[in-house]
Regions:
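Formylglycine-dependent sulfatase
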Residues: 2-3, 15-253
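Sec-dependent signal peptide hydrophobic core
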Residues: 5-10
Length: 253
């Protein structure tokens, strides 16, 4: 994942490219299997229409892997270009003197406005980290809920507006929390989940992977998971709609 970023940074430094540097929008989703995405062969229809549309317009990797399988170390591998045992972020703890430049540092150095929404504390070696904008607070002063698809569009619009005000191209990292638990409808402390996916799957329609047995509880859990995948896709749809509405879509990678 780091190689395209390094190529982009190299282009940004190049004088001939300096006047037409593209904006950068980096999206992640959390705890989602590749085979939950329609374009990558999901057996359940309609899980990811927005991701599928984006993929149809994009370069796709058929054989991509992460170097470490949990959250904060994985994200810091991506943003450092170093293995966990080299970047010092091997768990969920602060590394005050990592000794390497973060992706956001590199982008700021070449003139980008950097912003992040979601997973802020997991996306850098220590907190607070020097992003130009933390987009977890909405323009109305309310803290954005990590499962609210609409808020991701609002945050994206806010980040783009802040970059325009700074007269810089933007580099926004937008981290969607779904389908990480708690799944859709699993509200901590009980109550009704107000952030309803655009499609809710039934236990009777979900495919059962070969490593699980067909059991009512398994089906119910998978139905909640796939509904949360759909909500993650709703978030992606809101983000991409905000990008299009900003007029910056054609200038953004």
């Amino acid at each position: 994942m780091i190689r395209p970023f390094l190529v982009l940074i190299g282009l940004a430094i190049c004088p001939a490219f300096a006047q037409q540097r593209p904006n950068v929008l980096l999206l992640t989703v959390d705890d989602m299997s590749c085979d939950s995405v329609g374009v990558f062969g999901c057996k359940l229809p309609g899980t990811t229409p927005n991701m599928d549309k984006l993929a149809s317009q994009s370069l796709r990797f058929a054989n991509a892997h992460v170097t470490v399988g949990n959250c904060m170390p994985c994200r810091n591998v991506m943003f450092s270009g170093l293995y966990s045992h080299n970047n010092k972020v091997e768990g969920f703890y602060q590394v005050k003197d990592p000794g390497w430049p973060h992706f956001s540092d590199l982008m700021k150095d070449v003139g980008y406005f950097t912003g992040i929404r979601g997973k802020v504390s997991h996306s850098s070696p220590y907190q607070p980290y020097d992003w130009d904008a933390i987009l977890d607070t909405l323009p109305n002063g309310q803290k954005a809920h990590m499962k609210d698809a609409k808020s991701f569009g609002v945050s994206t619009t806010d980040g783009i507006a802040k970059a325009k005000a700074a007269k810089k191209p933007f580099c926004l990292v937008v981290n969607v929390s779904d389908p990480h638990k708690p799944f859709w409808s699993q509200v901590r402390g009980g109550g009704k989940d107000p952030y309803v996916p655009s499609r809710i799957y039934k236990a009777s329609e979900v495919p059962i992977p070969g490593f699980l047995f067909d059991d009512p509880q398994v089906r119910e859990e998978l139905a909640l998971y796939y509904s949360s995948v759909r909500r993650a896709d709703d978030c992606v749809g809101e983000i991409l709609a905000a990008l299009k509405d900003s007029g910056e879509e054609k200038k953004t990678v």
